[in-house]
């Protein structure tokens, strides 16, 4: 026996009701995500003096992100893809400072210096430690200069461009006769 009128209406009613209920229960793609920054940012980092300082990362789309360092604050809203960037005003050499980045969460970096940033690259000799040269009278004892920092980015192979790298903790280490 074929029922078309009443049972078809009931099926459509229950199907529509189920879709409406599920649409309110399922995630909509807007999953809360903490504010994050690339691995180059970390405690003890050095930021370039004498130029606008770029700070960037990821968060929820259209989330307000605020960056503060040494009494200077700048805010932005993330783009639709969740990326964000602010350019802090120029700063002179100095520190140590704290840098806070906040959105749905807060990240705090300590011992931040403003100064000269040098980028060095090379082959395997870039990993050679001066202390391995042996006894260099007077050289290593004078190497305790904690204002000088170094970050090492490990070699990684990828088939596609990357927007971050995996770093070891701590990222930035001060210059010392022990390293």
Descriptions of predicted regions:
Residues 1, 28-29:
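Short linear, low-complexity motifs centered on an aromatic residue
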Residues 13-27:
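Bacterial N-terminal signal peptides
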Residues 32-179:
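Cell-envelope and extracellular/periplasmic
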Residues 1-2, 18-21, 133-135:
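Charged, low-complexity surface segments at secondary-structure and domain boundaries
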Residues 1-11:
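N-terminal secretory signal peptides that target proteins for export/translocation
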